[in-house]
């Protein structure tokens, strides 16, 4: 009997502990939404912010024009800011929908979307409008993936969940020298009774280099400190004409995590490989990866990968880079070298020798050496192109120490401009 009593005494606390854990897990899940769509949650109060009811204040929607359609849209004058949301927490933003009257490349890069959490002065998100919503180059595309959608090429949808404990503020800034005459929007969010300390804050960083340096990796995400999760990237490339139509996507994705120095923990095998394709990169749209712009005639590509089912967490620091590397036959590379094209040979493929390493940091190999494979041997080389990217990530804090967004001249360089909208 004593033996059974001991077992019962030991088990009761364990059972209570497990029950509490189960309740805590359920409460955490319920904070976002119930596990089943037919379950009720007392922790969630839905809100929609639009011009018809900024912040979605209770019982104050559609008050203009005697409850008819009174304020569905507005304008953003040159140099002004348009407030989409400015509310107190805790809460979670679940969806953002926006459409605008002008969608030229200059407009999509001239507008900036900023997001602030917990009354911080520096935005956690500061990205060109078009790039933020999943397509770069100042272009639009008809698509739907796990984070973004543009059903008919005329609207911009985000489904990224963005928790905030104390406050959330979202604005669109018109940095163009003309007015934007039409903007419609909805920011759909929910107020919460309970904040979960495991929630992280959403951040996004955009960067463009109009002429990358051969041998220097492009920074998708400069080193950011804190605990967090790299959510993915939407990247764009405009290739330089001096490389003709030779393949540009041999560069490898790299993730430097938690103390990595010269070498990363995560490394890919090629640009098109990183987004799930192979042997070149055409246009396609998948749930987690795709290439929405593949315009060989104009030498432009815009592509994405979102790490939803393969999360990249970090505990102290994270840096994400992409090499800018291409490839073609050895004879083509030699011809470019003789014309003074900016490149550095990296590898050459021999039939029997396999992949031959020919990259040296202090010198450039002589490709005409008789010791190397023949003229048709595939040769990879560092190159210089116009590259830009959005890095989407979560941090355990509402602000980051990343640089401010680049100015409108850099953002819109060589993009089509409209004189007015």
Where are the regions that the model predicts?
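S-adenosyl-L-methionine
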Residues: 1
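Sec-dependent N-terminal signal peptides
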Residues: 4-14
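Bacterial Sec-dependent signal peptides at the C-terminal "C-region" and cleavage site
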Residues: 14-30
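Beta-strand-centric surfaces of beta-sandwich/beta-rich domains
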Residues: 25-421
């Amino acid at each position: 009997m004593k033996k059974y009593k001991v077992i019962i005494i030991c088990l009761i606390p364990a059972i209570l502990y497990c029950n509490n854990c189960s309740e805590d897990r359920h409460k955490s899940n319920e904070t976002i939404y119930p596990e089943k769509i037919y379950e009720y949650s007392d922790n969630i109060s839905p809100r929609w912010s639009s011009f018809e009811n900024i912040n979605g204040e209770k019982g104050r929607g559609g008050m203009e024009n005697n409850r008819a359609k009174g304020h569905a849209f507005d304008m953003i004058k040159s140099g002004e800011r348009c407030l989409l949301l400015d509310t107190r927490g805790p809460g979670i933003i679940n969806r953002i929908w926006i459409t605008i009257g002008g969608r030229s490349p200059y407009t999509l890069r001239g507008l900036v979307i900023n997001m602030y959490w917990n009354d911080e002065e520096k935005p956690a998100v500061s990205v060109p409008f078009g790039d933020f919503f999943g397509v770069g180059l100042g272009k639009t595309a008809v698509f739907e993936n796990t984070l973004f959608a543009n059903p008919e090429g005329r609207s911009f949808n985000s489904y990224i969940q963005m928790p905030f404990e104390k406050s959330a503020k979202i604005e669109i800034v018109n940095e163009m020298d003309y007015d934007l005459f039409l903007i419609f929007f909805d920011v759909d969010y929910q107020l919460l009774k309970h904040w979960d300390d495991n929630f992280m804050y959403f951040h996004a960083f955009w960067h463009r280099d109009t002429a990358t340096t051969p041998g220097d990796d492009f920074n998708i995400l400069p080193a950011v400190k804190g605990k967090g999760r790299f959510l993915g990237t939407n990247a764009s490339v405009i290739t330089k004409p001096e490389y003709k139509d030779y393949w540009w996507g041999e560069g490898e994705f790299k993730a430097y995590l938690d103390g990595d120095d010269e070498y990363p923990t995560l490394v890919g095998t090629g640009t098109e490989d990183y987004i799930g394709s192979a042997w070149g990169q055409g246009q396609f749209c998948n749930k987690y990866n795709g290439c929405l712009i593949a315009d060989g005639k104009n030498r432009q590509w815009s592509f994405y990968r979102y790490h939803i089912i393969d999360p990249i967490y970090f505990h102290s620091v994270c840096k994400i880079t992409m090499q800018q590397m291409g490839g073609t036959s050895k004879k083509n590379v030699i011809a470019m070298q003789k014309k003074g094209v900016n490149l550095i040979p990296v590898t050459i493929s021999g039939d029997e020798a396999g992949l031959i390493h020919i990259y040296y940091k202090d010198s450039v190999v002589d490709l005409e050496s008789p010791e190397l494979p023949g003229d048709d041997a595939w040769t990879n080389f560092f190159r210089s192109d116009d590259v830009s990217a959005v890095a989407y990530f979560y941090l355990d804090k509402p602000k980051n120490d990343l640089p401010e967004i680049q100015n409108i001249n850099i953002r819109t360089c060589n993009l089509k401009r409209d004189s007015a909208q």
